[in-house]
């Protein structure tokens, strides 16, 4: 099964117009927070036009965790039921461990696992399509909580079909990948080894082929474009500003300022094949976003997961 890459966040008409006119365009998959209802309606419009395929609705639990939003569980359930025929997957209202910005205790992780599981079971009883609902397992919670998700059986013998893994996205990617591989060891040795898994906020493209996940989501295409950069399959993320490097922007050394003429010509030809130019990318954030999304799509297609991609390391986590 090929990986589903969900582009996270809102997409504009300009972004979709640019992207959909690039070679061999296929409908993309999108994750949107339920807190952004206007963007969800926009995704419905794109679905109707054949531009968006799968739609993943996130609960907005992280915004609630940071204090930036309020969540009404019953209203969220009603909303999911009202759009059930439009969505592929939806996230439970989970409890993120601890308090935002503060050190976490063992009790915080125990409480988050318990409350998240209770919410998941409750939401299952209320949704039109409970199989679309994903429970969430958070970095730092006991692996017993993961085993609990995997061993659960409903009154008719049904299993959890799809679950979310929430790694600590502020952790070094090497630590994060080792943790996720240990999660997959637990999954593969469980009574539900074929469960679908979604990695929340997973931004490392090189890491994707090393993990047997079903799907990931990332908003990196927006962040890359916002910093006047684009993702190129051959060169990775490059800055296309025409400003010279300074002490304050060492991480933004411009491709335009540093690349040789052969490389510049190669990139110009690549962008021309997509229907754009380096100059247009410098001027348009929407075009930078579209070019980056196109490159990500190509990378994911050309770099599928293979067990041989994984080098087993000594276990770091107590499972």
Each model region followed by its residue ranges:
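Solvent-exposed, charged interface segments at domain starts and junctions
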Residues: 71, 121-147, 289-299, 318
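Glycine/Thr-rich beta-alpha phosphate-binding loop at enzyme active sites
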Residues: 101-106, 132-204, 212, 219-246
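Non-catalytic, usually N-terminal nucleic-acid engagement modules in DNA/RNA processing proteins
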Residues: 1-128, 297, 304, 311-319
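Arginine residue identity/basic-tract feature
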Residues: 37, 41, 86, 114, ...
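Glutamate identity and glutamate-enriched acidic tracts
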Residues: 26, 45, 74-75, 106-111, ...
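An almost-null, non-specific background feature
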Residues: 64-68, 96-99, 126, 142-146, ...
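Alpha/beta catalytic cores of nucleotide-metabolism and tRNA/nucleoside-modifying enzymes
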Residues: 1-23, 77, 81, 91, ...
């Amino acid at each position: 099964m090929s990986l589903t890459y969900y582009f996270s966040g809102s997409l504009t008409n300009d972004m979709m117009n640019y992207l959909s006119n690039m070679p061999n365009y296929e409908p993309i998959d999108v994750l949107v927070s339920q807190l952004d209802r206007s963007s969800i309606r926009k995704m419905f419009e794109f679905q109707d036009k054949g531009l968006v395929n799968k739609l993943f609705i996130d609960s907005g639990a992280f915004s609630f965790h940071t204090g930036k939003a309020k969540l009404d569980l019953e209203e969220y359930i009603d909303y999911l039921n009202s759009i059930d025929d439009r969505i592929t997957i939806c996230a439970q209202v989970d409890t993120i461990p601890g308090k935002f910005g503060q050190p976490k205790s063992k009790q915080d992780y125990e409480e988050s696992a318990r409350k998240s599981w209770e919410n998941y079971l409750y939401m299952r009883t209320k949704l039109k399509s409970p199989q679309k609902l994903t429970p969430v397992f958070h970095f730092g919670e006991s692996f017993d909580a993961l085993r609990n998700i995997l061993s659960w059986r409903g009154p008719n013998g049904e299993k959890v079909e799809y679950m979310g893994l929430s790694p600590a996205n502020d952790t070094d990617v090497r630590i994060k990948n080792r943790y996720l591989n240990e999660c997959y060891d637990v999954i593969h040795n469980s009574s539900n080894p074929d469960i679908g898994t979604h990695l929340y906020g997973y931004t490392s493209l090189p890491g994707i082929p090393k993990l047997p996940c079903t799907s990931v989501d990332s908003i990196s295409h927006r962040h890359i474009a916002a910093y006047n950069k684009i993702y190129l399959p051959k060169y990775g993320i490059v800055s296309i500003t025409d400003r010279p490097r300074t002490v304050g922007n060492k991480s933004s050394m411009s491709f335009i300022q540093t690349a040789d003429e052969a490389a510049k010509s190669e990139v110009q030809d690549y962008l021309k094949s997509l229907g754009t130019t380096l100059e247009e990318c410098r001027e348009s954030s929407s075009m930078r976003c579209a070019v980056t999304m196109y490159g990500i799509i190509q990378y994911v297609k050309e770099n599928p997961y293979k067990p041989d991609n994984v080098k087993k390391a000594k276990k770091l986590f107590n499972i």
